[in-house]
Amino acid sequence: MKAKYVPLILSLTMVISASAQLKKVDYKDNSQVLSGLSAIPKKVNSNKPGVLILPAWKGIDAHSEEVATELASMGYYAFVADIYGVDKRPKDTKEAGELSGFYKKNITEYHKRISLALAELVKQGANADNIIVIGYCFGGTGAIEAARANMKVKGVISLHGGLGKDAARETKEITAKVLVLHGADDPYVPEKEITAFQNEMRTAKADWQMNCYANAVHAFTEKSAGNDN
């Protein structure tokens, strides 16, 4: 699943910087305890920009931790969302598929978990009017869903995320800016899904961009991933 070359999103996947530390933050969805990670910048920008990070289907991992730490070193408040719950950590791809599949089918539940994580990011100090969402794979789908749900975010970035939406769902106007970074050879996103997504963005009157990277496949930002080509 690894790209044959790494795209220009390197700034979000750099080595961990010593200038920021991660802090565990517990929060709740009714009785379900969620446990995210917060990274607060040492040098605070007056605009207090915030970035919500939605991890891939296995939940919070080393990659999302690295991204949060690097963003904080760049001056952003960063928060890694826990979508599944503190007691739900997938041990393998089968469990990850089952858990992520539940939220894809029950999209309002996914929206709720994203919204709760956004609230925690603001509690950590981020400016509620200056937040973006970035997501990887399953989290990339979540980033697009944050835009579809018109959550209070300035923009979203989806990296090798699923683009599909239930055709029965209404397409509403999207106010957040949308950036999709996609592997041109991703075997999990068919051309018809790409076409439907682009038509959806036009119907939604979104300010959107979609960059397709040649020879890049699924999970191209994951250093430990394989190669589908």
Language-model regions, residue ranges each:
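Serine-hydrolase catalytic machinery in alpha/beta-hydrolase-like enzymes
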Residues: 24-124, 221-229
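C-terminal catalytic histidine-bearing segment of alpha/beta-hydrolase fold enzymes
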Residues: 37, 202-229
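Short alpha-helix in the alpha/beta-hydrolase fold that links the catalytic acid
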Residues: 67, 190-201, 209
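Alpha/beta-hydrolase fold nucleophile elbow
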Residues: 118-121, 125-136
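Gly/Ala-rich beta-loop-alpha elbow adjacent to hydrolase catalytic centers
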Residues: 135-139, 143
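A conserved short beta-strand
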Residues: 152-162
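Short beta-strand/loop motif that positions the catalytic acidic residue
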Residues: 174, 180-182, 186
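Acidic catalytic loop of the alpha/beta-hydrolase fold
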Residues: 185-189, 218
